[in-house]
Amino acid sequence: MKRLILIVQSILLVAVFASGQEMLNIATGKTEALKLSKASTIPTREVEIVDNSIIVAYNFTNVMISEDNLNPGSKFLKITGFCNENTPTHPSVLTRRDLFALPNANDIKIRLLESDFVEYDIPIAPARPLLTDSEDLFDTYADAKPIDSGIGIYPESIVNNEGYESRRNVDVLSVSVFPIQYDVKNKKTRIYTKIKYEIVADVDLRQYYESLDSTDDPVLENVVTKAISWGTAIDHIDSLYLTKPNIQDYLIVTVPKYMRAVKRFASWKQLMGFNTHILSRDSWNNSPDTVKHAIQNAYEQYPDIKYLLIVGDVEDVPAKQYESLQNNRHGYFVTDRFYASLNSDNSCEFYYGRVSVSSAQEAATVLNKIINYEKSPVTDASFYNNGIHCAYFQDDNSGNDRRDNYEDRWFIQTSEIIRDAITSKFGKEVARIYYAEPAVNPEFYSTESVRDDYNLPTELHRPNFSWDGDGDDIISKINNGVLYAFHRDHGEIAGWSQPEFKGQNIDSLNNGNKLPVVLSINCLSGKFNVDTCFAEKFLRHNNGGCVGIFAATCVSYSRCNDVLACGMFDAIWPSDKLIIKFHNITPETIASLKPTYRLGQILAQGMYRMSEYNFSNEFLTYQKRIFHCHGDPSMQIYSRVPTSFRRQESMVTKSDNLIQVNTRSLSTITFIDNKYHTFKSYTGTEAEYSTAYPDYVTVCVAAPNKIPYIVAGKHAILDGYIDFGPIIDDNPNNGMIADGIVKINSSSNSSTVEIKYNLNSLACSASIIITNVFGNKELTINNLPTGNNASVTTQNLPSGIHIATLVKDGAIIGSLRFAVSK
């Protein structure tokens, strides 16, 4: 039997800084008082892969017990790495999420193999809901509802399938583990000493993990790596620098009045390596279902779509409406995630964004800002070395007469965690624009956090720091030039509550092409279904403003927001310092293993980080729906001063019938043939393009933190619309479809494998080669039919992971992995 032990992990110590708590040894029942010192409730976890199954074993020794100050006699239990239930009317039992990357999570089975528990007479406290960023502290907690007496034993099962999120061909399964069960009627608490469970798949998982290669998608690679190994490096078979086709399609959904600006933008993205498609209708009939159906049809026609951009306000392209979690207070909210979730609410087929504009001029302003940011970045080094953090010290949990100098929320603490990581490891200069009420004396961070020292830095104590940050300070810094602007506090449709920065302040910005990316992590500032919200105002602003902004369309939840913010910064600047720690939601996670700079991926990385913190499905789904990328999801932020390619003039060479590119560093290399209106793009260090007319070919070489290098061919249109890259309308066959493998259908119920592909050249020699993951050839299919969505079938492949590669005239066009199980 093949075994692969991935890790035996002890979860980090938690510092306990609260009185009235005690440690319980689960097996013996002995307790001891806790003082202001570090204390351990560390479970162990062993994860191993055995053929087609994953086996997870937990062992628990101690649990911490504390009083519920709102319900005398009730208790909270705490185990490091597990969080308290936060669903109202439920008992506050402990749970965590285990995440696993799988080829097909829909077909897996989960079985409990072993478990042991000890029962105690401990009354569990009612669950407390998460706080929003628009409410004070105690009113919300006091609203925590009593436990529903009809629940019985909760949870019924201590290991549960919580569903999965799909991104491309990888499913990330979430499994909830409960070391505590509560008998509500009899007030009996089962505390488990051992939980062992198994996930059974229909393919060899070891072989599957060895075959994974997601180097074109850093977010997916980070998630897969964590889900497989929790930080253990994965050895990919393919070299990172091996040249391969860059297959990334980009779909833009809009209406005709924005077409001029959209076409120019689509042409630019084509140069940057995206096969762009425009989906336009005179009217979307105010129907999100109509929009989604059209996107679904486009995705079936172009299955390599990875980015979705909506251009237009909700009056142009509607957004999906849902009830908020507190509908009686906050009504409905809108989301565009609906359009990226084609298969289910848990799937997300593309990275998505919206440029919400209401006129052709606004569309031109915003899209041109994005093009210029990528194409001609500013040369001022100070712009890339500076950021601003805007936050509020909230200390009003007990009324003005009982302020205690401790921060009630995490606004300042989250800002300082991020600032410390960015300044100490990456050398950025981050200005603090902080505000506190004049009567407040900021001295300590919230004791809900886990840290060795709760004192604010000395430089933040009064009178060393004035705590009077305002809109004028923000305007001054942005006008001087900052790479990013971060806000953590309460928010509203008009803007930031404290330090106050609203639409009228944006009118005073004149930062020109020094355009920051804005992280507006608060409530409501991205509510684009009303008349010009803060995010729309910031993005649309001419002669400055921002180039992209993340913001929420409804009220958002405080701890989720703190985690989201740290996860987003960790996507750009990976650092262990960006692992935020709460007492009752302590993560078992690691920093991102690989940075990503694309806005849509940055948001997705933050969303995945929230999943690692064990928030309930209800809160996770809600947070994922409300936070949006206002801007281009494919745009890459310049995380440092951009530089030109070394010896770029010699990178591109042309002969009579061949163009060769050698970059010496990992790049996206794109060829646009202006004579035949064809498009090819590759990732790697070198690429070539065969043509009888090399002077008509435009070449673009791009890479993160590099200024794009463009060699224009004859008839190139570098500042307008390249008239190819289809506009999709009622004729689904409009436009050019790139050659490549489209989809592979295989089933555990059949030995037949269907391979769908696009092959548009009649006079060519083409074949499909099937290999195993180690590169050993298994089958060659010759004499391929040509056309869009052509197909061939084969049978009798052995069980396991295979790779199908389309070869045309001796050149690799594209490849796709697939699994066969019998």
Model-inferred region functions:
Residues 1-22:
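Bacterial Sec-dependent N-terminal signal peptides
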Residues 716-733:
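Short, compositionally biased serine/threonine- and acidic-rich segments at solvent-exposed termini, linkers
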Residues 9, 674-676, 736-822:
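C-terminal outer-membrane/trafficking sorting elements
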Residues 7, 19-20, 267, 713, ...:
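Intrinsically disordered, low-complexity regions enriched for glutamine and histidine
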Residues 21-721:
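Cysteine-dependent hydrolase recognition
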